[in-house]
């Protein structure tokens, strides 16, 4: 049986960090107000020379080094982003070129904050059917470009960044208890909630980019239930439950949502990876940034059972269960 394993991970952040106190100098807010409601202390903001593509390239290079591979070993690049460098071609193709890859194929996936989960699941499907041997999966976003910096309910939440993972096909023998890699994945979407979290513009409507708009309370109201339901489905598909979990790596949107979801799933706080305090919500980069952090600091070890999850505009949401 073919399983998809994550052979290497990497991340990249812009050079400039922006603390809550610095933000309060030009936005009507305060460190206390932001921390109490979100758990965020700072975020990273891209400068004019830092883009979704440039951050994605750096994260990809770090993941390749971590995996002990070169770009010649990669068959496909999948980029999850909602903030591409251009309307077209795909930013994944720009990353492919920047990495010196002129073989295989590359494309973008747009599922907002759920993007990395959707991209990783797509890559897993390619590996299982034999369409590729190794895939570079990247989540990269520069949400600072689409924020209304006069709207304190949204501009305090988001940051820029990128994360990447090298997904590799591996032949596995034995039952699920002896297997590693992606054990199960579940994806969901429902367009009935489009107006809860969106960008008010686009090439086909306004011919402009627009700004991010969000009904925060409404998103929170739905988020916890949707996240926990899809996580439970993911556990069930693998014949497991939350009591067996070693690490919960959620989308870093808001500390309140993370804590409420973990509590409902009966996952103790010491098993939850939280980086939202340092990065803010980096959209598609959120999960791979958190995963890379927990791997680099030694928390996640070989054999650990890990649940990744995310929810984003649309709504889109999903979860992936992995044996490391």
UniProtKB/Swiss-Prot annotation:
Pfam families: ACP_syn_III, ACP_syn_III_C. GO terms for cellular component: cytoplasm. It comes from the Bacteria. Keywords: Acyltransferase, Cytoplasm, Fatty acid biosynthesis, Fatty acid metabolism, Lipid biosynthesis, Lipid metabolism, Multifunctional enzyme, Transferase. Pathway: Lipid metabolism; fatty acid biosynthesis. GO terms for biological process: fatty acid biosynthetic process. CDD domains: KAS_III (cd00830). It catalyses: malonyl-[ACP] + acetyl-CoA + H(+) = 3-oxobutanoyl-[ACP] + CO2 + CoA. It is found in: Cytoplasm. Its main location: cytoplasm. Its EC number is 2.3.1.180. PANTHER family: 3-OXOACYL-[ACYL-CARRIER-PROTEIN] SYNTHASE, BETA-KETOACYL-[ACYL-CARRIER-PROTEIN] SYNTHASE III, CHLOROPLASTIC. The last Arg residue of the ACP-binding site is essential for the weak association between ACP/AcpP and FabH. Homodimer. Catalyzes the condensation reaction of fatty acid synthesis by the addition to an acyl acceptor of two carbons from malonyl-ACP. Catalyzes the first condensation reaction which initiates fatty acid synthesis and may therefore play a role in governing the total rate of fatty acid production. Possesses both acetoacetyl-ACP synthase and acetyl transacylase activities. Its substrate specificity determines the biosynthesis of branched-chain and/or straight-chain of fatty acids. This is Beta-ketoacyl-[acyl-carrier-protein] synthase III.
């Amino acid at each position: 049986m073919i399983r998809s394993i994550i052979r290497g991970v990497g991340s990249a952040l812009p050079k400039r960090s922006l603390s809550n106190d610095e933000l309060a100098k030009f936005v009507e807010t305060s460190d206390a107000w932001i921390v109490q409601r979100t758990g965020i202390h700072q975020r990273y903001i891209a400068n004019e020379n830092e883009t979704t593509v440039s951050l994605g390239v750096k994260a990809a290079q770090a993941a390749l080094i971590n995996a002990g591979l070169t770009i010649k070993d990669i068959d496909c690049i999948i980029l999850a982003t909602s903030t591409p460098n251009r309307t077209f071609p795909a930013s994944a193709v720009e990353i492919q070129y920047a990495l010196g890859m002129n073989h295989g194929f590359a494309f973008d996936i747009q599922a907002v904050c759920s993007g990395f989960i959707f991209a990783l699941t797509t890559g897993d499907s390619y590996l299982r059917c034999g369409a590729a041997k190794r895939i570079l999966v990247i989540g990269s976003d520069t949400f600072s470009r689409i924020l209304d910096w006069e709207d304190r309910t949204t501009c305090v939440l988001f940051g820029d960044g990128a994360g990447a993972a090298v997904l590799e096909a591996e032949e596995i023998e034995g039952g699920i208890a002896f297997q590693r890699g992606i054990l199960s994945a579940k994806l969901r979407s429902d367009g009935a909630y489009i107006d809860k979290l969106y960008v008010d513009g686009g090439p086909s409507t306004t011919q402009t980019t627009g700004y991010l708009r969000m009904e925060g309370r409404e998103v929170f109201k739905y988020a916890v239930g949707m996240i926990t339901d899809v996580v439970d489905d993911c556990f069930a598909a693998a014949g497991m439950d939350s009591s067996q979990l070693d690490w919960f790596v959620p989308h870093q949107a808001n500390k309140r949502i993370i804590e409420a979801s973990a509590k409902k799933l009966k996952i103790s706080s010491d098993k939850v990876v939280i980086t939202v305090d340092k990065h803010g919500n980096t959209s598609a980069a959120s999960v791979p940034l958190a995963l890379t952090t927990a791997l680099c600091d030694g928390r996640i070890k070989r054999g650990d059972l890990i649940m990744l999850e995310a929810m984003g505009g649309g709504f889109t949401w999903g979860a992936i269960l992995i044996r490391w």
